[in-house]
């Protein structure tokens, strides 16, 4: 069975692993997933990530906890295959008054909503993280 929404699968695996207090979560790798993992690491939501290139490449994400609680409190998929969400740089959503981040796929790559506003580019709002 093929996966319909690989990014939603990635976010669900992260959410489930954090609820089970796992230190690392693994999943099939893709270019988009690696780009999202890089943004999550740069923003401090995960401790790190690693790509292993065996027969099928897999992405391992090292989860981050603070005082026994997951750093990521909420992660939501915004744009989905059935309803894509494209926003201009002026209309990009702020998550919880700027405390969280929206991850946006732009023509200049995958970046946070703040970076996209600074670059003056819009794009597809992939997910929100708080």
Swiss-Prot record:
Matches recorded under SUPFAM superfamilies: Ribosomal protein S8
UniProt cross-references to Pfam families, sorted A to Z: Ribosomal_S8
- Gene Ontology BP, a term: translation
Coiled-coil intervals, chain numbering: none
This protein's UniProt keywords: Ribonucleoprotein, Ribosomal protein, RNA-binding, rRNA-binding
GO molecular function, a single term: structural constituent of ribosome
- A cellular component term, taken from the record's GO annotations: ribosome
InterPro entries given in the database record: Ribosomal_uS8, Ribosomal_uS8_CS, Ribosomal_uS8_sf
User: How does the annotation summarize its subunit structure?
Assistant: Part of the 30S ribosomal subunit. Contacts proteins S5 and S12.
Family according to the record: Belongs to the universal ribosomal protein uS8 family.
What role is this protein assigned?
One of the primary rRNA binding proteins, it binds directly to 16S rRNA central domain where it helps coordinate assembly of the platform of the 30S subunit.
Q: What is the official name of this protein in its record? A: Small ribosomal subunit protein uS8
Can you name the source organism?
A: Pseudomonas syringae pv. tomato (strain ATCC BAA-871 / DC3000)
């Amino acid at each position: 069975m093929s996966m319909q929404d690989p990014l939603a699968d990635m976010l669900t695996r992260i959410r489930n692993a954090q609820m089970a207090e796992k230190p690392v979560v693994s999943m099939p790798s893709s270019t988009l997933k690696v780009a999202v993992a890089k943004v999550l690491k740069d923003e401090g939501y995960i401790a790190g990530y690693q790509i292993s290139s065996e027969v099928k490449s897999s992405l391992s994400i090292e989860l981050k906890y603070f005082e026994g609680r997951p750093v990521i409190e909420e992660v939501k998929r915004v744009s989905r295959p059935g309803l894509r969400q494209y926003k201009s740089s002026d209309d990009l959503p702020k998550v919880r008054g700027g405390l969280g981040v929206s991850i946006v796929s732009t023509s200049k790559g995958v970046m946070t909503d703040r970076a996209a506003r600074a670059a003056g580019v819009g794009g597809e709002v992939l997910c929100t993280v708080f």
